[in-house]
Amino acid sequence: MTRTQEPLPTVAAPKVGFISLGCPKALVDSERILTQLRAEGYEVAPNYEDAQAVIVNTCGFITPAVEESLSAIGEALDATGKVIVTGCLGERPEKILERHPKVAAITGSEAVDDVMAHVRELLPIELDPFTGLLPVAAPGMRQGDTLAPSVKLTPRHYAYVKIAEGCNHTCSFCIIPKLRGRQVSRDAGAVLYEAYRLIAGGTKELMIISQDTSAYGVDLRHRTSEFQGEQVRAHLIDLAEKLGEMGAWVRMHYVYPYPHVERIVELMSQGKILPYLDVPLQHASPAVLKRMRRPGAGKQLDTIRRWREICPELVIRSTFIVGFPGETEEDFQLLLDFLEEARLDRVGAFTYSDVEEADANALDGAIPEEVKQERLARFMEVAQRISREKLAEKVGRVLDVIIDEFNDDEGDEPGTRLIGRTKGDAPGIDGQVYLYAGDFAGQVKIGDIVQARIEDSDEYDLYGEVIHTPEWRPNVPLLGHFGKH
């Protein structure tokens, strides 16, 4: 006689909404929280209507970001009544409670465990007795150094890899050390295993991020850790060399111009990592840099010249602040002169505004808003001209382009028009390449790396046609069929 077993009743998983605001470093924190939610059996709701509670990962750096975060918290409260606030603004709970006293819980940044404790309290989950959960992290690993496959908030073909948290600088306009603490680096082995897993899953481009990437490992006294049976030092040079051996595009962000960065540029000249440096210069006037409490006054041009001698293909991006307190017309002219001489490839700028709790708020010499805007316009006029001239030099060349999206017109065969980026363009902040697929229409997929002939350019973008679709072969065994192109 055969006994049939009645099916066990299923329990619907609690649904949690999620809002991620701020920079790529905050995005990585969001990915870690979402990974833990999934690992513990929670479902991520696509909208407020389906959510039983909402997590808001906030930004608290500049005033507009604070206001955006507070507005998002309010919307989530109106929709669900249960909101957990985390991230940078969470380091200032009084700011949140003043506007939204009914939030369920507040944590700071890098607080996955705290966030999950509050989620469990708000939405207790009944685990299936026949299903076990493996830990996302192992004993001795830093929070966020995951073993399990993680949730990504970027397309499959690129990812942000955060190598350190916090900052040791005391820039007068910045409150990051107050929000995120002093620098805490991850062991090199943890970073490399994460990169290895990402590439094995089909990721072709890694953006290496932190507040001060050049200082990676200083707090660890550059100790070694294990990666595939080898001891690797927690130093940017060693890390970059190992990452470069994996065969993906490796892009360096937030690189301060310390002397050892020349070794990184040498790796770029050898083709091991992308010839791209995101360098936060902020200004060129020694007087303004001193008031900002920033390094590099008087040495920036010499450093850039040396880098370009080592790697002529190097693309340099930087960001500047215009209208800092005490900035004279002479100071601003020094900045314009620097821009003309340095001929940076990618430039961003914004006008100075007070940041709550920043030391710069107490500086005298506030610049009128109309003067700030006038200087910003002059700055961007120079920057756009230089960008237009530098991009025009690429016309006629064949460049590698990673495809981010389709851009088909109505009536086009699918995959006829593509948008991608060169090795000199990071997603979201730099230029794009608009391509006609030609004979390769319908064959190129998002995430493919193609070769394209550049036919035209403007201030920020390039235009061209696909001429070849080589197969992508990293030095990491791929999971599944991710190797085509």
Curated annotation (Swiss-Prot):
The gene is rimO. [4Fe-4S] cluster 2 binds at residues 167, 171, 174. GO terms for molecular function: 4 iron, 4 sulfur cluster binding; aspartic acid methylthiotransferase activity; metal ion binding; protein methylthiotransferase activity. Catalyzes the methylthiolation of an aspartic acid residue of ribosomal protein uS12. The keyword Oxidoreductase does not apply. Keywords: 4Fe-4S, Cytoplasm, Iron, Iron-sulfur, Metal-binding, S-adenosyl-L-methionine, Transferase. It comes from Deinococcus geothermalis (strain DSM 11300 / CIP 105573 / AG-3a). Its EC number is 2.8.4.4. Its main location: cytoplasm. This is Ribosomal protein uS12 methylthiotransferase RimO.
